[in-house]
């Protein structure tokens, strides 16, 4: 798990690429992109989160191979587990049935640019599931024991 600005996440991944110990341990990855808006009302804080779940892939895969090898076998199971545990979190105040978000399957992501025309942000060949605008409410003063 990583969190931060997308460029910071890429810098961390680049450092891992240079490390013999972590070069092949970068993926699968769940990353929370910051900054995000927080709306505060009383003791409740509501945030709209942008998250990516990604794994490395082969640059010569066709879409059907990507779905079979990376999405069905790796990314979808991670997505399902992530959402299951996110909904069960005692810190989430949104009812599980009321969570709203946009899910995007990103085939061959990382070579055409992540946000607009900034160019490539991820330096690896990856397939990903992007979760946009995951709206959830949290207690303002929740503490982890």
Question: Whereabouts are the PLM-identified features?
Answer:
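Short, charged interaction patches at domain edges and termini
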Residues: 40-44, 93-145
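Short acidic, glycine/tyrosine-flanked loop/strand segments centered on an H-E-D-like triad
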Residues: 46-66
